[in-house]
């Protein structure tokens, strides 16, 4: 069915209150959108982190009388009469199908392909990871995931143990297993990520070699030959004492989810225990790798 969208601009501080106002006026869903394409860094647990200049978008049933909606919103103290807004009709689409149609197989490095589970494999002789991301982060399309996949593809993982810290969809752990790792361990704070990783591991026939944990359940003595963490700069800095003990002596570390402008501060958090390689950048993001001293 078609929908009507009402968009208004506000500050991040007022976005939640105006979201409530739109819902009270009859919106069936609310979306927050950055007005200026500004990066948003990691929120605190339970916090919705918003941009300084935020578009609040309400979605309404096509039969809604938007004059009535606007009249209700004009009564809100943050808006008032004649408040700036934009109303447009959205065409009827199968949004999930459109997303699926735009997700294609992607190659990383020399051997590795990430393939949507609903697509044909482009190269039967390659290392193919069949992926359905579900609600978890990690499809290979983001520069940070791409940087990590390229790094893993260039390693000799045969017989190695790999930890994927912040595993999301499981893409990095599963890729490592398909590239020859004997065992992988995925850790994530989100139960949906654990389930997505489990489903994708089964789809790729590697579930017997993948262990998955919420942080509260992970083994105390967890160690690996290779540790990869594609999260964000803040957690990477804060969790450096925890992440640094995961690689064995001489083990490898790969970090991403880091803006290039944040690389120096993340490197500083790991330089004492690791011999770090030159930072690799892609678009505005980067990857930091090193070897445990």
Swiss-Prot record:
Q: Which family does it belong to?
A: Belongs to the methyltransferase superfamily. PrmA family.
Q: What does the UniProt keyword field contain? A: Cytoplasm, Methyltransferase, S-adenosyl-L-methionine, Transferase
**Catalysed reaction, written as an equation:** L-lysyl-[protein] + 3 S-adenosyl-L-methionine = N(6),N(6),N(6)-trimethyl-L-lysyl-[protein] + 3 S-adenosyl-L-homocysteine + 3 H(+)
Q: Which GO terms describe its molecular function?
A: protein-lysine N-methyltransferase activity
Gene3D superfamilies referenced in this protein's UniProt entry, alphabetically = Vaccinia Virus protein VP39
Q: Which residues bind S-adenosyl-L-methionine?
A: 145, 166, 188, 230
Answer yes or no on keyword rRNA-binding. Answer: no
Tell me where on the tree of life, at the top rank, the source sits.
Bacteria
EC main group? transferase
What processes does the entry annotate via GO biological process terms? methylation
Q: Which NCBIfam families does this one have?
A: prmA
Location within or outside the cell: Cytoplasm
Q: Which Pfam families match?
A: PrmA
Described purpose of this protein according to its UniProt entry: Methylates ribosomal protein L11.
Q: What is this protein called?
A: Ribosomal protein L11 methyltransferase
One Gene Ontology cellular component: cytosol
Q: What is its main location?
A: cytoplasm
- Give the EC number(s) listed in the UniProt record: 2.1.1.-
């Amino acid at each position: 069915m078609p929908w009507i969208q009402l968009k208004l601009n506000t500050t991040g501080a007022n976005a939640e209150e105006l979201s409530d106002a739109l819902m009270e006026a009859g919106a069936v869903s609310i979306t927050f959108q950055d007005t200026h394409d500004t990066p948003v860094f990691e929120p605190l647990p339970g916090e919705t982190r918003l941009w300084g200049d935020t578009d609040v978008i309400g979605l309404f049933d096509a039969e809604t009388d938007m004059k009535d909606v606007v009249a209700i919103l004009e009564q809100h103290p943050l808006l008032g009469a004649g408040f700036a807004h934009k109303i447009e009709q959205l065409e009827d689409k199968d949004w999930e199908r459109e997303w699926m149609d735009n997700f294609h197989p992607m190659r990383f490095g020399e051997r590795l392909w990430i393939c949507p589970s609903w697509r044909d494999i482009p190269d039967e002789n390659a290392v193919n990871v069949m992926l359905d991301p579900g609600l978890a982060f990690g499809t290979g399309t983001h520069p940070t995931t791409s940087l990590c996949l390229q790094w893993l593809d260039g390693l000799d993982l045969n017989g190695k143990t790999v930890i994927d810290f912040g595993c999301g969809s499981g893409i990095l752990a599963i890729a490592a297993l398909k590239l020859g790792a004997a065992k992988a361990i995925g850790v994530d704070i989100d139960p949906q990520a654990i389930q997505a990783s489990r489903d994708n591991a089964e789809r790729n026939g590697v579930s017997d070699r993948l262990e998955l944990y919420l942080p509260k359940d992970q083994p105390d003595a967890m160690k690996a030959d290779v540790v990869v963490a594609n999260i964000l700069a803040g957690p990477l800095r804060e969790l450096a004492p925890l992440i640094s003990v995961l690689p064995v002596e001489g083990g490898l570390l790969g970090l991403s989810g880091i803006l290039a402008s944040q690389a120096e501060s993340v490197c500083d958090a790991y330089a004492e225990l690791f011999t770090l390689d030159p930072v690799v950048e892609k678009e505005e993001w980067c990857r930091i790798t090193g070897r445990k001293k």
